[in-house]
Swiss-Prot record:
The gene is bcpB. It catalyses: a hydroperoxide + [thioredoxin]-dithiol = an alcohol + [thioredoxin]-disulfide + H2O. InterPro entries: AhpC/TSA (IPR000866), Peroxiredoxin_AhpC-typ (IPR024706), Peroxiredoxin_BCP/PrxQ (IPR050924), Thioredoxin-like_sf (IPR036249), Thioredoxin_domain (IPR013766). Disulfide bonds join C44-C49. Residues 1-153 form the Thioredoxin domain. The lineage of its organism: Bacteria, Bacillati, Actinomycetota, Actinomycetes, Mycobacteriales. The active site is at C44. Its EC number is 1.11.1.24. The keyword Hydrolase does not apply. GO terms for molecular function: thioredoxin peroxidase activity. This is Putative peroxiredoxin Rv1608c. Monomer.
């Protein structure tokens, strides 16, 4: 999946087990969908907490933040509870959506099932930006915000 591509609609359970559909999430504005390798690990915690801490900034650009990993619902629930996340964490337990986005790993799949990648998706399901960085955790939220601000001011 790259900038300009159209994302196929999908539905996955969030950390409460509630089914969440992309098209419904997009009804409130753009979605910043960030794939992370594993809940409760240091890098993923840093990344997800940075998204949490920028809640006001994302609200200003009318964008929703949505985390996604291959972790089961119960692990997502614990992650969300411990870190007090105010956004959905989707459970892509089979890796179907990760494969659709081209971020599912092959050989490294056991340790890190998905590539740390963020997609900024507009309300028409078009990809506005793709942010890839395995090591710069803050870059994902920061660059997504920069993209959304540029579009709003443009």
């Amino acid at each position: 999946m790259k900038t300009g591509d159209t994302v196929a609609d999908f539905e996955l359970p969030d950390q409460t087990g509630t089914p969440r559909r992309l098209s419904v999430l997009l009804s409130d504005g753009p979605v910043v969908l960030f794939f992370y390798p594993a809940a409760m690990t240091p890098g993923c915690t840093k990344e997800a907490c940075h998204f949490r801490d920028l809640a006001k900034e994302f609200a200003e650009v009318r964008a929703s933040r949505v985390g996604i990993s291959t972790d089961p619902v119960r692990k997502q629930a614990k992650f969300a509870e411990v870190r007090r996340f105010d956004y959905p964490l989707l459970s892509d337990a089979q890796g179907t959506v990760a494969a659709q986005f081209g971020v599912k790993r092959g050989l490294l799949g056991k340790l890190m099932p998905v590539k740390r990648t963020t997609f900024v998706i507009d309300t028409d399901r078009k990809v506005l930006d793709v942010i890839s960085s395995e090591f710069s955790m803050d870059a994902h939220a920061d660059k997504a915000l920069a993209t959304l601000r540029a579009i709003r001011s443009g």
